Amino acid sequence: MKTAIVAGCRTPFLRSGSEFADLPAIELGKVAVREALARSGLRGEDVDHLVYGTVVHDTQAPNIAREVGLAVLPKTVPAVTVSRACSSANQAITDGTTLIEVGQATGVLAGMG
């Protein structure tokens, strides 16, 4: 099975506690997911799985992937949060690729930031 990245979008790089300090992580995630869908031309119904990487967990959303997924994607789309410090988004993309390669999904939204 071949896989391809069809679009990219991420939250901005900022110093912790700076410009977006008052913006909840879930809100940033929703913006990133909506924009990734828009750039790719895909609809939420085309996504079989959401794999969301995060550097620091938000205590208000311990599984931010599910919170963001419920807000943006169909409720049937499973979502998992990957936490691996600075390489979280890369690990999420790797995990998403694996889901496609083993036949568990055809469309995966993976990465974030």
Where do the model's predicted regions map?
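Phosphate/pyrophosphate-binding loops at sites that engage ATP/ADP/AMP, CoA/4′-phosphopantetheine
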Residues: 34-48
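Short beta-strand segments at enzyme active-site cores
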Residues: 46, 51, 109-110
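Conserved catalytic cysteine-centered active-site region
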Residues: 23, 54-106
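Short amphipathic alpha-helical segments enriched in leucine
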Residues: 10, 33-38, 69
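Conserved beta-strand-centric core segments of catalytic alpha/beta enzyme folds
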Residues: 1-32, 92-113
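Residue-level "edge-of-site" marker
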Residues: 50, 81-82, 113
